[in-house]
Amino acid sequence: GRGRGQTYTRYQTLELEKEFHFNRYLTRRRRIEMAHALCLSERQIKIWFQNRRMKWKKDNKLKSMSMAAAGGVGYHRP
């Protein structure tokens, strides 16, 4: 990532992604733990999660739209 904004190492990103996979919202305690583990500030963790949730929402919206366009797969009544 060039220009403004924080760049994260591959390891940090992987760990954050892994955590996000299990919880989209972090407790403060978990955030502190992650900040220590990844050598980031709590604020950086918080912002990463906010951005990740936005991206997730956008991706999900696209997914549900394409599902609808595909004729709502999975809604077959007998």
UniProtKB/Swiss-Prot annotation:
Residues 1-60 bind DNA. Signal peptide: none annotated. GO terms for molecular function: DNA-binding transcription factor activity, RNA polymerase II-specific; RNA polymerase II cis-regulatory region sequence-specific DNA binding. Its main location: nucleus. InterPro entries: Antp_homeobox (IPR050296), HD (IPR001356), HD_metazoa (IPR020479), Homeobox_CS (IPR017970), Homeodomain-like_sf (IPR009057). One of its GO terms (biological process) is anterior/posterior pattern specification. It is found in: Nucleus. It comes from the Eukaryota. Sequence-specific transcription factor which is part of a developmental regulatory system that provides cells with specific positional identities on the anterior-posterior axis. Belongs to the Antp homeobox family. This is Homeobox protein Hox-A5. It comes from Salmo salar (Atlantic salmon).
